[in-house]
A protein has these predicted regions:
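ATP-binding N-terminal substructure of ATP-dependent carboxylate-amine bond-forming enzymes
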Residues: 1-97, 128, 301, 351-366, ...
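Short, conserved charged micro-motifs
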Residues: 56, 130, 162-167, 326-332, ...
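Active-site nucleotide/adenylate-binding loops and adjacent lid/helix of ATP-dependent enzymes
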Residues: 103-181, 200-202, 223-241, 387-391, ...
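Internal nucleotide-binding/catalytic subdomain
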Residues: 154-264, 273, 285
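Short, well-ordered beta-strand elements within core beta-sheets of diverse protein domains
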Residues: 155, 185, 283, 367-375
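Short beta-strand-to-loop capping motifs
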Residues: 157-159, 196, 321-325, 371-377
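Active-site "cap" helix and flanking loop/linker of ATP-utilizing ligase/carboxylase catalytic domains
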Residues: 234-255, 260, 270-330
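Glycine-rich active-site loop/lid that clamps phosphate-bearing ligands
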Residues: 321-354
Length: 427
């Protein structure tokens, strides 16, 4: 008998999970406030509702008699997932767990209270109050919306300048629902990402990626990671400890961590799997299917055999695609053409078609697809991504806008002067 699985979100990042649920023979219900989102084309039924509308999603879930509810790549959907799971008695993170893990201010407070490594921070809903509080922080500063995801609204300010800080504050404020901005000291180090899985209170799997970032937006990942084994061990211990302290015992966990000499600092940790092709990358490199484990866990089924996450069966990488300016997509190679041209490519997910309006790649929500491929090392990664960019043959017609850049602020929400090659190069 088919299980009715509700998936929160129907964008490009949710598409692989939607396809996996279909492949497993489930009746798939997608929830999203954008009817044109690509994931709806692959589900059996869709609900036109925001994933942050707890009561709206709960009402639909009850009417449709769902058996499970999941999401991926979306922190903002986790509180809704938790609420519906609690209401219907389904597996999912607790309300308290979702509260701490989906809000940057709450997560920093949780880290501070439990004496976990974290940057010094303040938060406020008005700039004048924030300006007074941030005098206690050391420069440079990171401005972040407290309850957004996908790298939206993140700004870095180098100088304690009133005008620059004000611009950064209100730019981050645009992306909040609560109106609260989190301001924290910048941490130097090597930034890594990855996916893990909790089962019966234990971190049974944890794959750590090398992460490539441009203006705080991920543009790619690679396995194996680029940090030492001793740091990998310490990182896994930190993730396991944080999950236990926040009472997260079963389900996927996505993380971004800064690794520096003597310090492992969790930047973000979500009660869901990651987007940007990480699941495909992890499966190819380790043999562990994060999406399949997520679906099985949501249906109260055993997640199956878990491989040794310290071993990489084969090296591979992912490339997140985006355009540096507004435009109408005129031409782009198909997935089949790209695979034929580049034999290392084994997975392509494109979320746009010719004729679509493309927005600048200033956050993960504006990506146009992901490509996953085999690669030996970082040098090989750079060569293959350059080849992919060339073979994609992307051409757009420009749309003029009157947007003004945020000068002197390091922000992915300023005007992108870089071209596609620079945006996707290895940093």
């Amino acid at each position: 008998m088919k299980k009715r699985v509700m998936i929160l979100g129907a964008g490009p990042n949710q598409l692989p999970l939607i396809k996996k649920a279909r492949d497993e023979g489930h009746f798939v219900i997608t929830v999203d406030y954008l009817p044109e989102n690509i994931g709806h084309r692959f589900s059996h039924h869709y609900v036109n509702c925001s994933t942050t509308d707890k009561e709206g999603v709960a009402s639909a879930a009850q009417q449709l008699s769902i058996d499970a509810i999941v999401t991926t790549a979306s922190d903002v959907a986790v509180p809704t997932l938790s609420y519906v799971a609690w209401l219907l008695g389904l597996p999912g993170p607790s309300l308290q767990t979702a509260h701490f893990m989906s809000n940057k201010v709450q997560f920093r407070s949780f880290q501070q209270k439990n004496r976990l490594e974290c940057p010094k921070f303040i938060h406020s809903d008005t700039f004048d109050d924030a300006w007074e509080k941030l005098q206690t922080l050391s420069m440079p500063l990171m401005f972040k919306p407290s309850d957004s995801s996908g790298s939206r609204g993140i700004n870095r300010v180098e100088e304690r300048d009133y005008s620059l800080c004000k611009k950064a504050f209100w730019n981050s404020h645009m992306y909040t629902r609560s109106g609260i901005v989190c301001i924290e000291e910048h941490i130097d180090g090597i930034e890594v990402g990855g996916d893990g899985f909790m089962s019966n209170g234990e971190l049974v799997f944890c794959s750590i990626t090398q992460k490539f970032v441009r203006w705080f937006v991920p543009v790619g990942h690679r396995l194996p990671t680029n940090i030492a084994m001793e740091d990998q061990i310490r990182l896994r211990e930190q993730i396991a400890t944080a999950c236990k302290l926040v009472d997260y015992n079963n389900g996927p966990v996505n993380f971004d961590v800064m690794v520096s000499r003597g310090h492992i600092t969790i930047i973000e940790m979500g009660a869901r799997s990651g987007g940007n092709g990480i699941a495909s990358l992890v499966k190819h490199a380790t043999g562990f299917d994060v999406h399949l484990a997520t679906l099985r866990n949501s249906l109260a089924m055993p997640i199956g055999k878990v491989p040794d996450c310290k071993k990489t069966i084969r090296g591979c990488g992912s490339m997140i695609l985006g355009i540096s300016q507004n435009g109408i997509l005129e031409t782009m190679s198909s997935a089949q053409e790209l695979k034929a041209e580049i034999p290392q490519v084994f997975d392509c997910n494109f979320s746009v078609s010719c004729g679509d309006i493309i927005e600048p790649f200033i956050h993960s929500g504006n990506q146009i697809g992901t490509v996953t491929f085999s690669c030996k090392d970082e040098s090989d990664y750079a060569q293959i991504t350059a080849c992919i960019e060339k073979k994609l043959s992307i051409r757009i017609s420009t749309i003029k806008t009157n947007d003004e850049p945020l000068s002197n602020i390091s922000s992915h929400d300023q005007d992108f002067s870089c071209n596609l090659k620079n945006a996707l190069s290895v940093k």
